[in-house]
Amino acid sequence: MSDKTPRKPTAFRLEQPARVSAASEQEEPRRPRAVKDLEQITPQADVFDLTDDEAAELEILDPAFEAPERKGWSLSRILFGALGILVSFAIGIWTEDLIRALFARADWLGWTALGVAMVALAAFAAIILRELVALRRLASVQHLRKDAADAAERDDMAAARKAVDALRTIAAGIPETAKGRQLLESLTDDIIDGRDLIRLAETEILRPLDREARTLVLNASKRVSIVTAISPRALVDIGYVIFESARLIRRLSQLYGGRPGTLGFIKFARRVIAHLAVTGTIAMGDSVMQQLVGHGLASRLSAKLGEGVVNGLMTARIGIAAMDVVRPFPFNAEKRPGIGDFIGDLARLNSDRNARK
């Protein structure tokens, strides 16, 4: 053990480190004072942006598509049907007389003509069958559109599932819809309201197609606008607008899974033109455009560039009408494109071209 006596407990005063208050570190607030000669930046409005009133007027000329009611036999249908039967009889009699004459001249000529006639008949039957299948597919798309709208309005889950299954069948060959179809297939056993199921199918399956369709419409409108601006004759403008519009209609129908044949394309184009005629925008010219945008847009461009914008907008209008006709579901969850979505791009395209000259 140690000889040292233990130290008695003693109280000690500890030296506390100096604390710097946060308030002292802060600088004193600057007294308010007047500042002069500030540099003011005034934003310039885009001359090609539409006001709310102008956009509303554009939307009035761009109503949604409503499928016309199917009418009975008309006089024009009876006329063309009777003429078609007469032409078929004439071709048949002419072919028979030709084969008989060839048999009278030489047997091998007659048999050759008969074989060629059989091949032509088989090819004609195959073409007719393909066209009938395409027409049936186009009709099924129109019926599906009505069924989907009715199921969403009544919030019918059974009808909605039936419409979604039909949509998945139509979009089965479209790679862009694979992810959406897989998602909807995984929800087969889930309980979902009919209206929500229709909106979900529209978002997951048709949204990628809508995005690509808008790109097709915008590119076609730009091409028409440029060709109109540089073409020397109005006949060239009209011809190219018709060509580009026909190609746009066919590409949109193929995009949404319609795949129309020749007769189906003609019927589809008639529906698009009828939709345009009902809205009264197929004859929209430069004077109408000046009234439409308050004498603003067309007056800011030269006459030729203004014609390019008008023809480009007409092509966009045809593309929007084609989307209305061929889209399997009506626009519900997704926003329907309008003319206002394309007018700014077309005007800027032509103004940039004018600035480079």
From Swiss-Prot:
Main location: membrane
Domain of life where this protein originates: Bacteria
Stored InterPro entries: DUF697, UPF0283
Entries under Pfam families matching the protein: DUF697 (PF05128)
Start and end residues of each stretch annotated as Disordered: 1-36
The entry's keywords: Cell inner membrane, Cell membrane, Membrane, Transmembrane, Transmembrane helix
Cellular compartment(s): Cell inner membrane
Bilayer-spanning residue ranges: 78-98, 109-129
Membrane topology (UniProt): Multi-pass membrane protein
CC terms in the record's Gene Ontology section: plasma membrane
Biased composition annotated in UniProt, kind: Basic and acidic residues: 27-36
NCBIfam families for the chain: hyp_HI0043 (TIGR01620)
UniProt record similarity statement: Belongs to the UPF0283 family.
Protein name: UPF0283 membrane protein BMEA_A1074
Organism in which the protein naturally occurs: Brucella melitensis biotype 2 (strain ATCC 23457)
Organism placement in taxonomy: Bacteria, Pseudomonadati, Pseudomonadota, Alphaproteobacteria, Hyphomicrobiales
